[in-house]
Amino acid sequence: MQPYPVLETLFRHHLWANLRLLEVCTALSDEQRQSSSVGGYGSIGDTLQHFVRSERSYFSRINTGQPYRHPEDAPPLTFAEMAEWLRDSGEGLMLGVQTKIPVGEFVAA
């Protein structure tokens, strides 16, 4: 019996959910994307930028030991760029668990 690829499945769902969230937010008007709520990272647009950049930084840290540093003066990411970054990190995480964690080995929390 083959082990159930739990981490790969979780990362696959994570990628799907991130891209789905981005897809939903793409359909929002500019006014809606500029709105904010309690507990967010500013506006919806700012929150999207934050979570996509953070995802890239987490992935970089896992792969290289170093965080990704987004230039301070860089313009905001477009929706196409955010989708590309999310795909790159999401697919990289899935590939990482397929190739870096031997079958039957446990990952300590």
Annotate each predicted stretch with a short phrase.
Residues 1-109:
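Aromatic-glycine hotspot motif
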